[in-house]
A protein has these predicted regions:
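A generic "structured core" feature
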Residues: 9-18, 169-172, 178-179, 269
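Active-site gating/metal-coordination segments in enzymes
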Residues: 57-58, 66-161, 199, 209-210
Length: 283
């Protein structure tokens, strides 16, 4: 199609907001890593304003507890931040090492009314099939909530990420509403195959559909072409747009432009950029 119609509105399902102390730690961690220089600010109001200027109607945002003892604090911060951002849709966080992990999850869903959770497996350093969080999956499923999970091995594999343990979770909870971040890179094909058996499994496009993404810097054998036009058409009802903003070292447009350049029917673009997320999240 090439370009969006005038006035087109987006839903971005993958953005990051953190308290200032956590942002500072994250940016320090990335400092000095070639290709991971971030030009964008991190203030929540600024992020919301920027996204609004890009035609973003609603955006999903989250933080993550990288160790025990942080999840309650972060969820309270996310809840308070969401009160100031009418377009924002917060997802909660948990950590399996918290002895009250189920209580934390229930508070996020029932007290704060979060739409679900974000798990970042290789940052939080737990396996997706960790027995301590199986009750959390049960709560997500029972409440019709959504899990956004970074479970692919991109950009830096470690012992916690990867496909097999996530596949095990989906065998246990095949009806779970789940969005796999970054098109499941570097295991995109395996995630696409798993979607055949999991009717509520989605993939988000964040950082995966542009050749400028640092995901591919050290992996020339992978790239946006891992997802074909045929894949986008076949799974047009279960792919959702995400950007990774403001953790994007390239212009925001580069997250959308390569998708618009795919020769897809306008209806497919509308589903990916807006309608699928609107339906899934009940917006």
């Amino acid at each position: 199609m090439g370009t969006p119609p005038p006035g087109f509105r987006y839903i971005d399902v993958h953005t990051h907001l953190h308290p200032p102390w956590l942002w500072a730690a994250i940016r320090r961690w990335f400092a000095g890593r070639p290709g991971w220089e971030f030009p964008y600010g991190t203030d929540p109001e600024w992020v919301a304003g920027f996204l609004g200027e890009q035609g973003v109607e609603r955006f999903v945002f989250f933080s993550y507890a990288h160790k025990a003892g942080l999840a309650r604090e972060l969820n309270a911060w996310l809840h308070e931040t969401a009160r100031r951002l009418p377009a924002g849709v917060p997802l909660g966080t948990i950590h399996p090492a918290d002895p009250d992990v189920v209580d934390v999850a229930e508070e996020a869903l029932d007290r704060y009314g979060f739409k679900g959770f974000k798990f970042h497996i290789n940052v939080q350093r737990f396996h997706p099939d960790d027995p301590r969080i199986l009750p959390v999956y049960e709560r997500i499923l029972a409440r019709g909530a959504v899990l956004l999970i970074h479970v692919g091995s991109a950009p830096w594999p470690n012992e916690y990420d990867g496909f097999p343990r996530f596949e095990r979770v989906m065998h246990m909870f095949p009806e779970l509403k789940v969005i796999v971040a970054h098109m499941g890179q570097f295991e995109t094909r395996r995630h696409l195959e798993l979607m055949e058996r999991c009717p509520n499994m989605y993939l988000d496009t964040a950082a995966a559909m542009t050749a400028r993404s640092p995901l591919y810097r050290d992996r020339p054998d992978t790239g946006p072409d891992d997802v074909t036009d045929g894949d986008l058409v076949r799974w047009q009802d279960r792919i959702v747009f995400g950007s990774d903003f403001p953790n994007t070292p390239h212009p925001y447009h580069d997250e959308r432009g390569p998708i618009w350049e795919r020769p897809l029917p306008e209806t497919v673009h509308r589903k990916i950029f807006h309608d699928n997320a609107h339906r899934l999240l009940g917006l």
